[in-house]
């Protein structure tokens, strides 16, 4: 049978949590973040080291975000990345990281700390 997909063995049997950069914490990004947290719980229950997610988003929560994204009125004026990561960390007991900034758009500007095993973009503009 022809192999269609390839998964690096490091992702299947890692020694450390798989690092994930999630770029954007709006409508799609907030949902993806929540599901990554649920996936992390499942992976850990199966003996996998789980995930370590860094969320990048420079935006703040506005009234237009309420209802369309996973934010409430108490979140108004807060940075989206800080707000969402704090909520996830408190709920699931994680130590994931918020970066209230844009992800570097030029690869030569990317420092080691910005690299991850998986990068997911959830933005509507660049």
Regions picked out by a protein language model, each given a short descriptive name:
Residues 1-126:
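Adenine nucleotide-associated cytosolic modules
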């Amino acid at each position: 049978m022809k192999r269609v997909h390839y998964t690096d063995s490091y992702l299947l049997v890692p020694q450390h949590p798989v690092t994930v950069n999630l770029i954007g914490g709006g409508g799609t990004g907030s949902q993806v973040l929540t599901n990554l947290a649920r996936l992390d719980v499942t992976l850990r229950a199966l003996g996998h080291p789980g995930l370590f997610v860094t969320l990048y988003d420079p935006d703040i929560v506005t009234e237009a975000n309420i209802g369309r994204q996973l934010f409430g009125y108490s979140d108004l004026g807060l940075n989206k990345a800080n707000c969402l990561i704090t909520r996830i960390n408190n709920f699931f007991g994680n130590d994931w990281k918020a970066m209230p900034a844009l992800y570097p758009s030029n690869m030569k500007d990317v420092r080691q700390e910005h690299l991850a095993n998986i990068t997911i973009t959830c933005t509507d503009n660049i």
